[in-house]
């Protein structure tokens, strides 16, 4: 039996930002560690919407993942949680 490790990509995050908060971003801009969610116009409620969508999609609780300030940090934390099964 093989275990598939799921990774949320910057492209997927950009799509979720559009869906959850109506914020359109270039996925390449999300890769820059210096850019914070606020720089893209995404507030905490929009980020919670993204977390909720990911929790539903992957059937995993992502507690405290909404506290990340940048997209890159968010992806690192979420992908780490998905890889570990946490």
UniProtKB/Swiss-Prot annotation:
- What is the source species? Streptomyces cyaneus (Streptomyces curacoi)
Sites bearing O-(pantetheine 4'-phosphoryl)serine, chain numbering: 44
What superkingdom heads the lineage? Bacteria
A biological process (GO) of this protein is: antibiotic biosynthetic process
Signal peptide stretch = none
Pathway involvement of the protein, from the record: Antibiotic biosynthesis; curamycin biosynthesis
The chain positions of domain Carrier read 7-86
Its annotated function is as follows: Acyl carrier protein.
Q: Which residues form a coiled coil?
A: none
Q: What is the recorded post-translational modification?
A: 4'-phosphopantetheine is transferred from CoA to a specific serine of the apo-ACP-like protein.
Supply the name of the protein: Curamycin polyketide synthase acyl carrier protein
Keywords for this protein: Antibiotic biosynthesis, Phosphopantetheine, Phosphoprotein
